[in-house]
From Swiss-Prot:
It is a multi-pass membrane protein. One of its GO terms (cellular component) is plasma membrane. Disulfide bonds: none annotated. This is UPF0391 membrane protein Psyc_0130. The lineage of its organism: Bacteria, Pseudomonadati, Pseudomonadota, Gammaproteobacteria, Moraxellales. Belongs to the UPF0391 family. Keywords: Cell membrane, Membrane, Transmembrane, Transmembrane helix. The chain crosses the membrane at residues 6-26, 28-47. NCBIfam families: PRK13682.1-2 (NF010227). Coiled coil: none annotated. It is found in: Cell membrane. It comes from the Bacteria.
Length: 51
């Protein structure tokens, strides 16, 4: 999931450099959502493993 977040972040950066603001914003939102979801799942897995 971290890989997909990085891919969408790179797409957002490339799109912003090329002037595609809508695509850059959408890709940045996807990257943020995927990164947040991955961190939450990591924390849940870490806590459930320790108990």
């Amino acid at each position: 999931m971290f890989r997909w977040a990085i891919i969408f972040a790179v797409i957002a950066l490339l799109a912003s450099f090329l002037g595609f603001g809508g695509v850059a914003g959408l890709s940045a939102n996807f990257a943020y959502i995927l990164l947040a979801l991955a961190v939450i799942l990591f924390i849940v897995a870490f806590v459930s493993r320790r108990t």
